Amino acid sequence: MARYDLVERLNGTFRQTEHALATLTENLEQQPLLIARVFSLPEVTKEAEHNPLATIAVEQHLGKEAESLALRHYRHLFIQQQSENRSSKAAVRLPGVLCYQVDDATQAALENQIQHINQLKTTFERIVTVESGLPSAARFEWVHRHLPGLITLNAYRALTVIKNPATLRFGWANKHIIKNLRRDEVLAQLEKSLNTPRSVHPWTREEWQARLEREYQDIAALPQQARLKIKRPVKVQPIARVWYKGQQKQVQHACPTPLIALINTDKGMTVPDIGELLNYDADNVQHRFKPQAQPLRLIIPRLHLYVAD
């Protein structure tokens, strides 16, 4: 019965999210659009979904065309809504911003709507990742049994609302996931894998077991106090840097989906200055500040595991 109730909540929360998104997009369409600028990125095919991106060509859209793309993007939740050739694993991203003229009452209503949508999205993600009690490998099958074709990342992804920005500038962020580990923690992880033999394509179970044993010996040979670090690259992400003149403050936002900027004319606010997102080229990345990197030696490539020399 508890599992049935959880499925009911999963479906109910998702349907509420769909309805709330539909209501929001209808309400936004009724507001005076001051300026809209979004940037579509190339479609990632199924064959290329794991390939690193050296370049990204950006196509700019303005005005009502940009608004239409953005409002459709907010409701893009299923693979059935996209090309059959597009990867269902690669995130669908549409950086940019929609700027609407609002008064005090409209601003409060839209902010409440967006907050409600984000609460529903958080609840939905918690049902899937926590309350289901399922390991990550089993969640995909469980969710898609009840919501076939769902793009879970799009369902989780929150909407970002900003108020009265002075300027917006778009760019790209290169990041790494960093995690420090002790030698014995890595040994325990490898030992767990050794005790549950399986095959991993393209290796047989015996070949994979032999690889794990070599990795175990390599780690066991290190001093107990060796400093180990997982440094896994994350695919380049579009970002927005927002400047607030009154507060003399800049805030950086991840920008996989268009920001919603509310410009309150009751308070005398004006249209912000919006920059362009340039094409990404990994060979020409310029770092504002790049600290001296700690010397690291790669010891287990598949885990992106390094040892500090």
Curated annotation (Swiss-Prot):
Cell compartments where the protein resides: Cytoplasm
Molecular function as annotated in GO: DNA binding
GO biological process, one term: DNA replication termination
Keywords: Cytoplasm, DNA replication, DNA-binding
GO cellular component, one term: cytoplasm
Family: Belongs to the Tus family.
Its biological purpose: Trans-acting protein required for termination of DNA replication. Binds to DNA replication terminator sequences (terA to terF) to prevent the passage of replication forks. The termination efficiency will be affected by the affinity of this protein for the terminator sequence.
Protein name per UniProt: DNA replication terminus site-binding protein
Organism: Citrobacter koseri (strain ATCC BAA-895 / CDC 4225-83 / SGSC4696)
